[in-house]
A protein has these predicted regions:
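N-terminal helical capping/dimerization or prosegment-like subdomains
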Residues: 1-75, 237-241, 258, 332-336, ...
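Acidic/histidine-rich catalytic neighborhood of metal-dependent amide-processing enzymes
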Residues: 101-172, 176
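Metal-dependent amide/peptide-bond hydrolase catalytic core
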Residues: 3, 24, 74, 174-353
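Short glycine/proline-enriched coil/turn segments at helix->beta-strand junctions
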Residues: 37-42, 47-48, 60-61, 116-121, ...
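Active-site metal-coordination/substrate-binding segment of hydrolases
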Residues: 61-125
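Hydrophobic/aromatic beta-strand patches that form the interior of the parallel beta-sheet core
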Residues: 64-66, 127, 154, 313-315
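A structural signal for short hydrophobic beta-strand segments in well-ordered beta-sheet cores
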Residues: 43, 86-88, 222-225
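Buried hydrophobic packing segments
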Residues: 32, 105-115, 143, 196-199, ...
Length: 353
């Protein structure tokens, strides 16, 4: 194990031992800030987001963002070991946040510290963010506008160091059908439940005119429904929830408007900020992916990449299938591999640019 990998693992063990659930990450932010300062990286902080720029940062040059997050979900009830006790067993490092996304955070940190003084045709900007797991208002949503122009990004999440070049967006729709109450025995009123059922049937077979070349068709699933107060009263309202996985074929706002026109129910989006992303195959990030032998794919999960209005890909050590699971772990060898691939990828990107 080389010195960089050992440094990364030591930092990860410290982070695991420091609880950092979303919206309560101040202690891990303190640790990361101190670590970067100790290594001469001149860190800055906004809320619990910690960031640092490469030496000789020049706003006139392109900027590559290296982003991961240091918040975690809360531990699952089925843990059989202390989630905050970093434990090494063979090649496995156990602990909450080890895989999602601590391994990516420490691997990107070591990569940044190695390359921050190297002559590259672009700036490096490291941002270890908070509130990713809850898409909170004090995470990347607040930080991004304060970082200046960014041209492209690598987002560190557990992908087995393969490159997720696209993510579907997400819009959750609260839908309400309205009718008129009446006595069920006399067939009175207008049954809001039937209106909702017609709309749900329409959503089940709805097809948009355009389809994304990379992300495929927009996906719609109705996941919740509630109506009625008692058996003999025709319900005058029926509420249901639709989970809509959007693509780059339409903006989230366009998607909502198309569905509004198709339904009788009132449609209210909870948010439209989780946008789809799709990396053009000709972009330097995509070319570096191919040149370094990384497989590309479309990710089924969302991340802070959804908030980024510039080309980006998601790539990091670990496996997505371990995220949010009891007895979470990452392989030490995955961290070593991750640092090496990040460095190789950035150097290849420099050659392309």
């Amino acid at each position: 194990m080389d010195a960089k990998t050992k440094e990364a693992i030591d930092l990860l063990r410290t982070l695991i031992a420091t609880p950092s659930p979303s919206r309560d990450e101040s202690r891990t932010a303190d640790l990361i800030f101190a670590y970067l300062a100790e290594h001469g990286a001149a860190p800055e902080r906004l809320h619990n987001n910690v960031f640092a720029r490469s030496a000789g940062f020049d706003p006139a040059r392109p900027t590559l963002l290296l982003n991961s997050h240091h918040d975690t979900v809360r531990p699952a009830a089925s843990y059989t070991r202390d989630p905050y006790a970093p434990t090494v067993e063979g090649d496995r490092l156990y602990g909450l946040g080890s895989n999602d996304a601590g391994a990516s955070a420490v691997s990107l940190t070591q990569t940044f510290l190695t390359l921050r003084t190297r002559p590259l045709p672009f700036n490096l900007l490291l941002a270890l963010s908070a509130e990713e797991e809850c898409m909170g208002e004090h995470g990347m949503r607040t930080l991004l506008p304060q970082l200046g122009r960014i041209d492209m990004a690598i987002v560190g999440e557990p992908t087995g160091m393969q490159a997720a070049v696209g993510e579907r967006g997400l819009v959750v729709l609260d839908c309400e059908a309205r009718g008129k109450s009446g006595h069920a025995a006399r067939n009175e009123g207008v049954n809001a439940l039937y209106i909702a059922l017609d709309d749900i049937a329409r959503l089940r077979t709805f097809r948009f005119d355009r389809c994304s070349d990379l992300l495929g068709p927009i996906g719609i699933a109705v996941t919740q429904i509630a109506a009625g107060t008692q058996h003999n009263v025709v319900p005058d309202t029926c509420r249901f929830v639709a989970d809509v996985r959007t693509t780059d074929a339409y903006t989230n706002e366009e998607t909502v408007e198309i569905l509004r026109r198709a339904l009788r129910s009132e449609v209210t989006p909870r948010s439209t900020r989780i946008r789809a992303s799709a990396l053009n195959a000709a972009h330097p990030l995509a070319r570096a992916t191919a040149a370094t032998g990384r497989e590309s794919y479309v990710s089924p999960t969302t991340s802070d990449m959804a908030l980024m209005p510039f080309p980006s890909l998601k790539m990091g050590p670990g496996q997505s299938s371990r995220s949010h699971t009891a007895d979470e772990f990452v392989l030490l060898s995955e961290i070593e591999e991750g640092i090496g691939i990040y460095e190789k990828f950035i150097k290849q990107l420099a050659e392309i640019l």
